[in-house]
Structure formats: C-alpha cells, structure tokens
Amino acid sequence: MMIDVFLIALLLSILTGNIKNVLKYNYKGLYLFAIPFVLQLLPWKEILVPLSFVMLFLFFIWNRNIPGFKLMAIGAVLNGFTMSVNGGKMPVWEPTLKLLNLDLDFKHTAFTEFSWKTLLADYIPVYLPWGRKFVISVGDILVFIGVFIFFVLKPRFQTQPSRVPHES
C-alpha cells in the first residue's frame, strides 16, 4: 500500500505545484533512505529488520524539520518495534487476512490472539477504490499521514522576507 500512498501523494504534489517545494529541501543522509528496504529483503531478519528501521529512523530524525518526517519517524518506530519483537516479521491478524482473502508474503506472519507483541500489528482492513486490499497497522497510518503532509502541504519555508523597521 505504501506505493499507492506514495503515488497518490506525488500526483497531488504535482497537481498542486508543491513538488517544487519537495525538491528544495536539503535532505541529510539521503543514502539511508533506500538501504533499509534492501536490508529487509535479505535473510537474517532478526538482525537486519531492526537495523533497517534504525536507519530509517535516523533518516527521519536528521530531517525532522521537513514537514511530515516526525510522523513518519514515529510510524517507523512503531512498525520496527513490532517487527523486531516478532522475529523480523510484521504480524497480521488472521481473521482480517481471511476477510480480505489475502495471502501472507515473506515479510508477514499470521496471528490469532492479541498480546503485547501484536498490539501494534497489521489488523486494520483497507479497500482501495481500484480494487486493491491491504491490512495495515497504526504505524502504517502515521507513515501515510506523514507522506501526505510531506508531499501535499505547502511548507512554511525558513526564508521569510526580512522586515525593515520604518524610519521616522
């Protein structure tokens, strides 16, 4: 679903003309953004998934002055914690999987009983108008809101016109 959210937010950013603002930011540690996604594809999930979320968190924190990044950081921490305490996989509530007729992928594991380890898991069903279905978590929602804030809301840039006092 992240791809759907990203593409919708990007399209809205282009349509509203806010894309020029997105390109103006001075991003810190931009290399840290892609590496975590690659790490999550590799074996040794118990080690690499927590490491990937630490890298994402650092990227978001280093860029916390950019609108939406604080929410993305909080969402990433919630998801990273949940995956870390569940063997590197995100738990998905099995009844929701069955309701949506979805299968698990390599990054997810099913659960049927809630515990402290699954409190922040994927259990919220989402139906998109174009027929795609997902199960998402509270952390995902925070990340998605952060992405929309980043792409769509117009920032209050630091370069405000200087005020010259009136001479009497």
From Swiss-Prot:
Q: Where is it mainly found?
A: membrane
Q: How does it sit in the membrane?
A: Multi-pass membrane protein
The record's annotation in InterPro entries points to: DUF5317
The record's GO CC annotations read: plasma membrane
Kindly list the places in or outside the cell where this protein is found, as annotated in its UniProt entry.
Answer: Cell membrane
Record field: transmembrane: 41-61, 133-153
Matching Pfam families, A to Z?
Answer: DUF5317
Source organism, top-level taxon: Bacteria
What are the UniProt keywords, alphabetically? Cell membrane, Membrane, Transmembrane, Transmembrane helix
Name of the protein this chain belongs to: Uncharacterized protein TM_1467.1
